């Protein structure tokens, strides 16, 4: 998709206290030989373009999502010159809660996800490092800094220093340390940050003052079309570039071309379990929980970067259409993407589940929340935590919830529920190549339990393109 490009660059060399220079239109991408710190301004309730943010959910609207998809292409082509990114850093969602309902800020992560799909990770996946794998997506760093504590958020199972994200309020100066380390490491390339205006301005200001760059930084919010870059030469000189994407998104949820075909039939072997004890072991009633697995992961064993691949972006963006008429949740949940995982050779932020169902929440204007108690690789504890969270809390009675998560946790959850109801039935394994199934757990008015897989997304992984959609 074509859109006009306008790039204005204001240069102020480090060590020079020059006044603001005239804006000169240009279309020159950043120099790959410099350390380029690129700041993408995500929108929030305080700083946004008209109709990009839903005031009730503090999430993107269809228009805001379309802007992020268009922005990714502009960022890749016009700012990076189609070069590959070195690092992507997004706001830790639970550090910025909005509205009286305290919704986490998923906008920075969603804003930069399409850009991550346009870049590639190339990393080792064996101990000797002789074998490299190039993925059709890039990882996003969004995990908590070492020692960082967030009110109401469970501490991570392990700290991931290499996948630190951005803290909205810069707790402990962690954002400053992140930028300072990148400058000190002095590895040429492109480092992209996605955060709200308040946080971004603070990051640029501290970097400017600490290093004595004397750059003439913007003093006020100029809208989501602007992208700022501080570029540092090998000699240590710095300059500021201000880019204007001139993007005009459509006002509705973005369509896909081609639109993935959706089938009414499901491939998984059907099952149906029910249990009706005299006294149900859980307290909730009239509740439905839809379990959906994250979108397509990397197909190579023992290699992981926490994100999904290009096919997954097609699936995630197609979910609103694929699920229309099949499910009817009134709220959406996923695990906190700031929780980290490890493949043995590479640590990563686990963004895949939350980003899979984010477009569905956007398209349907649904409340979106994150849970930090459901962590990776801790099945026994997680199973009971999940049961207590969703089925022993009255806030979920009389509601339908969509949960995007990790497929290995679903069978233990269902089996534990059945066992608690006195049933000897156990859930089947969820096939490793199955990204399409939906497991539905229902409690009726008396608390009786049924579980089945009678519906599915209807999207065939094999028919999805292996390159990301273009906008």
Predicted regions and their residues:
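Sec-dependent signal peptide recognition
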Residues: 1-7
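C-terminal motif of bacterial Sec signal peptides marking the signal peptidase cleavage site
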Residues: 13-15
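Bacterial signal peptide processing site
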Residues: 17-19
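Active-site-proximal alpha-helix that buttresses catalytic centers in soluble enzyme cores
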Residues: 21-180, 186-188, 200, 204-394, ...
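Cysteine-clustered segments with highest specificity for TGF-beta superfamily mature ligands
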Residues: 190-193, 402
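C-terminal active-site subregion of NodB/CE4 polysaccharide deacetylases
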Residues: 397-399
